């Protein structure tokens, strides 16, 4: 049986992920929560630009309708 999208996200809990937003913003952090709407909570969140950290946020919530993709990071 094929994996469902939320199953894949669930496997990334407590691991580092890259969250890409529709407007091109990228956040990296530890995925500590999510819901069925793809609202995500990241700990130690960092805003990236061209792969470099430009701002550190700590804990943030990203609204699911802004999310384009969620991917495990190489460090995670």
UniProtKB/Swiss-Prot annotation:
| Gene Ontology biological process | mRNA splicing, via spliceosome
Q: According to the UniProt record, which cysteines are disulfide-bonded?
A: none
* A GO term from the CC aspect: ribonucleoprotein complex
Q: What Pfam families does the database record attribute to this sequence?
A: LSM
Query: Keyword Ribonucleoprotein: yes or no?
Result: yes
Tell whether Ribonucleoprotein is among the UniProt keywords: yes
Top-level taxon of the source organism: Archaea
Gene Ontology molecular function, alphabetical: RNA binding
Q: Where is the Sm domain?
A: 4-76
Keywords from the UniProt entry? Ribonucleoprotein
User: Which InterPro entries does the record cross-reference, listed alphabetically?
Assistant: Lsm6/sSmF, LSM_dom_sf, Sm, Sm_dom_euk/arc, snRNP_Sm-like_arc
Q: Which SMART domains match?
A: Sm (SM00651)
What is the residue range of the signal peptide feature? Answer: none
Q: Which PANTHER family match?
A: SMALL NUCLEAR RIBONUCLEOPROTEIN F (PTHR11021:SF0), SMALL NUCLEAR RIBONUCLEOPROTEIN F SNRNP-F (PTHR11021)
- Which family does the entry's similarity section mention? Belongs to the snRNP Sm proteins family.
Which NCBIfam families does the protein's record reference?
Answer: PRK00737.1
What is the protein's name according to its record?
A: Putative snRNP Sm-like protein
């Amino acid at each position: 049986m094929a994996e469902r999208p939320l199953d894949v996200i669930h496997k990334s809990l407590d691991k580092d992920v890259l969250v890409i937003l529709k407007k091109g913003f990228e956040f990296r952090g530890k995925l500590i929560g999510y819901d069925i709407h793809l609202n995500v909570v990241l700990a130690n969140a960092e805003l990236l630009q061209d792969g470099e950290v430009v701002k550190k946020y700590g804990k943030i919530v990203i609204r699911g309708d802004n999310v384009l993709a969620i991917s495990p990071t190489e460090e995670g």
